[in-house]
Amino acid sequence: MSRYTGPSWKVSRRLGISLTGTGKELARRPYAPGDHGQNNRRKISEYGMQLREKQKLRMMYGLTERQFSNLFVRAGKIREGLPGTNFMVLLERRLDNMVYRLGLATTRRQARQLVNHGHITVDGKRVDIPSYEVEIGQVIGVREKSKDLKIISEAVEAVVGRPQFVQFDADKLEGSLVRLPQRDELEADIDDSLIVEYYNKL
């Protein structure tokens, strides 16, 4: 399955989440496209709830189905911790997500484009693979020739706050993962136990 590249607001309304992180998609019409209010929503089966939760998280991080399921398998091989939490931590460690968390991009989609176009470095070396897994202490920065990009400066200026598991130097436009995130620091509106149940039934 290919990565969805269409209008994010339609998916946001259908799944009941803000993929952009701004919440604007849900502000005016907090119901799915085609519905005319919450009364038209049909009761969802247990499987439907599991599937929707999986789709919410997959769309939130912008992964293909294959990327998403492969990462879940990897999380299941980690002996310590809960599978759902381990899965979400692996998602967080993706380079495109870390660029977003550091505030170098306003959305994960924008962060993925910055990585794809070669604007991002890891420990001083250009890395253009969004799925690159960031290790604790690695320095994520912006290429020297890309530091004047308006899209990056506007993103940094718009940051209200950053997660406690990252640190960022605004002058150098670089930061790092200082520790692995705790579950309560990640997406609160995601029930990862439903995702675990979904994949366990396959």
From Swiss-Prot:
Pfam families: Ribosomal_S4, S4. The keyword rRNA-binding applies. It comes from the Bacteria. Residues 93-156 form the S4 RNA-binding domain. Part of the 30S ribosomal subunit. Contacts protein S5. The interaction surface between S4 and S5 is involved in control of translational fidelity. Belongs to the universal ribosomal protein uS4 family. This is Small ribosomal subunit protein uS4. It comes from Pediococcus pentosaceus (strain ATCC 25745 / CCUG 21536 / LMG 10740 / 183-1w). The gene is rpsD.
